[in-house]
């Protein structure tokens, strides 16, 4: 599996494009906010001849969904995330205002729900979805057993507990 990492937006967010030898791919957390970030993502996809099969979100906090409208327009990709986070989409404008900016485009509805235990396939690669509520009610991590690789969004941070941007985050709530 080939992994390309981008660091996007003002918060910042790690966005990943995973692909394999078949040229099929998935995008995880398309947090591209600025036009140059969107174009960098597009350039990588197009230059590598990738056929993106899934647009996955680890959760639906504002900073992780900025690029979803762009990818829907550009490639017809509908975002996939856990249903427990869907309410964040209706609060995106209020979240943006809370941080002093306006969304360039409204969020787009989810195309599919991702549940604990779902297997996402692209090419010859499989990712297992694992529901890990805490940072947000619908937090999902994506695990590739064959590569022993985990894409955790904001659930794990190196050397810290990260930043809970939204007051509804409940890092110590027992689930």
Residues covered by each model-derived region:
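Conserved beta-strand hairpin/beta-sheet module of binuclear metal-dependent hydrolase folds
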Residues: 1-48, 141-153
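Core dinuclear metal-dependent hydrolase active-site scaffold
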Residues: 3, 117-144
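Short Gly/Pro-enriched turn/cap motifs at secondary-structure boundaries
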Residues: 6-8, 103, 109-111, 131-133
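Divalent metal-coordination and catalytic microenvironments
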Residues: 18, 29, 59, 71, ...
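Active-site metal-binding loops of divalent metal-dependent hydrolases
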Residues: 30-32, 60, 83-84, 134-136, ...
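Active-site HxH/HxHxD metal-binding segment of metal-dependent hydrolases
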Residues: 33-38, 42-122
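A short acidic, helix-capping loop that chelates divalent metal ions and anchors anionic groups
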Residues: 88-92, 159-165
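Single conserved hydrophobic/aromatic residue that forms the stacking wall/gate
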Residues: 166-175
